[in-house]
Amino acid sequence: NVQALVYFDAKKACDYRAATSGRSLEGFKRLARDPHFQTTPLPPTPSTRPTSPTSPTASTRPTPSSTPPTSPPGSGGGSPAGFTAAMTPNSGALWGTSKFDKGWEAQMGRKFDIVHVYHQWSHSFPTATERALAAEGRLLLINWKSPGSWPAVANGSQDAQITTTANRLKAFGDKLFLAFHHEPENDIGAAGQPADYARAFRRVVDGFNRVGADNVLFVWNMMGFVGGHGDIYPTLYPGDQYVDWIAYDPYNWYGCKAGHKVRSFAQITKPFYDWTAAHAPGKPLMLAEYGLREQPAGSPSKAAWFRDSLVQLRTTRTRIKALVYFNNLHNCDWRITSSSASVAAYRDIGRDPFLNRLH
């Protein structure tokens, strides 16, 4: 039996150093802190960040460390106290919105933790506006749509764009969430097959690893309709080592699509919540989009629905660590401002300490 391990932490014929990337170093520290190796006291954790790699990093992403840096949001990539390195709050959940507006945020009486934005493959982002939002302490959730072909990404023909974007986000510095081609269930066939998506996702992550873009947190963002897609989710999933967060987009479709009944927050979130508990139990969950319209007489109101969502987050949906409301007039009127009661309820839950995480 092996009774001792001595790592060759040096640069010789190859660069074997554990600190070739932030992810590598965090993984090595987690290994060293495992009780199996705890035979002598460990030295204090260094206070400085590791140097960015000068050679390609490993193609896997270790599970984020539970010991965060102490930098506040907007100050260069660290995690504040009370958060893991993957920006998972140790308690409570992050609160966010799409279609950001400062006037509307002022109505809420607090800053949003997350602002959700959407970009195409060749876009240059974060934009100046997005950088300003991040500089004020908000986290960006960026949906990055592929060029229309997952095989083209997976086979390396899009590596130049991946490297360009990875270097830009590395230079940005702050922690951010990046979802590669969200809701891929909608594009199976046109963009490729489920296995192509998983390979493309891994190719993107590997490209970011190569340049040392350690501030980027990768989000696997599904629609979350288990009834129609549950059989393909295992093939779409790129693997735990490539995913920091799992996100899905549940909606209460009553009044927007024919044949849909009124459904509670617990009901719309349950199927995919249960699926992830069985297939990826260690990953934090995010509602990257969710919404409802005003509800019919005799049903719980939109305001009551919001208030109940906070109850569920505290009790039955404790693995959901971030929720981002789809505050848009899109295929339905999902806007919070559909009634004064809706605004008041949404404002009240946002001010609750459970959701008041970053600010």
Which residues are covered by each model-predicted region?
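Long, well-ordered alpha-helical scaffolding segments within enzyme catalytic domains
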Residues: 1, 164, 169-170, 194-209, ...
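Glycoside hydrolase catalytic-domain groove-lining segments
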Residues: 1-3, 7, 128-145, 251-296
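N-terminal carbohydrate-binding/catalytic regions of secreted carbohydrate-active enzymes
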Residues: 1-2, 8-33, 87-175, 301-305, ...
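Aromatic-lined carbohydrate-recognition surfaces of secreted/lumenal glycan-active proteins
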Residues: 4-10, 85-86, 97, 205-231, ...
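Active-site groove signature of glycoside hydrolases
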Residues: 5, 165-195, 216-225, 246, ...
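Aromatic- and acid-rich polysaccharide-binding/catalytic face
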Residues: 8-10, 112, 116-117, 233-263, ...
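Ser/Thr/Gly/Pro-rich low-complexity, disordered linker/stalk segments of secreted
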Residues: 43-81
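Surface-exposed cleft-lining segments at the edges of enzyme active sites
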Residues: 145-156, 183-194, 223-226, 248-265, ...
